[in-house]
Amino acid sequence: MKTILTACLSLLFCIHVKAQSNFYKISVGGGFGVTQSFTDLKKHSFGLAGYGLADYYFTPFISAGIEGQMGKIKGDDTKIPPNERYFTNSYKAFTLNGRIALGALIDYEKNGFSNTIKGLYLGTGLGLVLNKVDRIKEDREVPLYPGKESSKNLLFPVNVGINFYFSDHSDYTRYILNFNYQSNLTIGEGLDGYDDSSKKFRSGNPDIYTYFSVGLRYQFGSVGLFKKTVF
C-alpha cells in the first residue's frame, strides 16, 4: 500500500512539474518596417524605419518595456491641386509600452490552433516623437502654409501583433519572431510640419502614422516560473 501511495504521489508531482515552464524575464531586439502617414495631406505615402526595444516579462505573455524608432514619414500632394504640398519627416520616437498576449487568457494547450495563436497580443503606451521635417520653403512674410520644421509631440501608440516563440536547449524561450502593426496618434501639428488650424483646408483630424514591422528578439537574464508550458 505504501509503495502504491508513493508511486501515485510521484506521478502527481511529475504531472505538476510538467505543467509548468521557465522563462527569461529580459528581452532585447529590433527590426525594420514601413511607415504610412495620415495627416493633413491627402496622399498617404510610405517611408522606411527601424526600431530597437527592451522588455521585461512578468510572464511569457505579459510584458512592459521601452522602444525607440528612427526613420522617415512621408506625404506628397504636389500633384493634387490646389495645395500641392509635400513633407518628409526624419523622425525619432521613444515610447513606453505594455502588452498582453492571448496565451495569458486562454488554455492553449488543448488544441493546435490555440497554441499557434497564443502569441497574438494587444498593447498600448505613451511616448514622444521628435519631428524634423523637410517641407515647402516659403519667402512670404505671411506664409501660405504655416507650421514648423522642428517640433515635439506627445505620442499614443496602439500595438497589434503576434509573437512566435523558439526555445533553447533547456526548453526556455530564447528567441521571438515578431510581426507588429502599430498605430500612432500624435497630439499637435508637427508630424507633417503644417499647421492648418487657421486654413480652410484643415482636416480636423489629429496627425497619425502607422508602422508595420518585422523583428527578432533575444531573451536572457533572470528566470521566472510560469504555470503552463510554452512549447
Give the residues covered by each predicted segment.
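Short glycine/proline- and aromatic-enriched beta-strand/turn motifs that initiate or cap beta-hairpins
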Residues: 19-57, 63, 219
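Short loop/turn motifs that connect adjacent beta-strands in outer-membrane beta-barrel proteins
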Residues: 20-25, 61, 104-118, 166-175, ...
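Residues that define the transmembrane beta-barrel architecture of outer-membrane proteins
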Residues: 24, 44-50, 90-94, 116-118, ...
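Residues on the lipid-exposed face of transmembrane beta-strands in outer-membrane beta-barrel proteins
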Residues: 30-34, 52-56, 96-100, 124-128, ...
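Transmembrane beta-strands of outer-membrane beta-barrel pores
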Residues: 32-38, 68-74, 102-104, 126-132, ...
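Extracellular loop and loop/strand-boundary signature of outer-membrane beta-barrel proteins
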Residues: 36-40, 77-88, 142-149, 198-204
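Gram-negative (and chloroplast) outer-membrane scaffold detector with strong preference
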Residues: 62-140
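Predominantly the C-terminal beta-signal and adjacent terminal strand-loop region
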Residues: 78, 91, 165-231
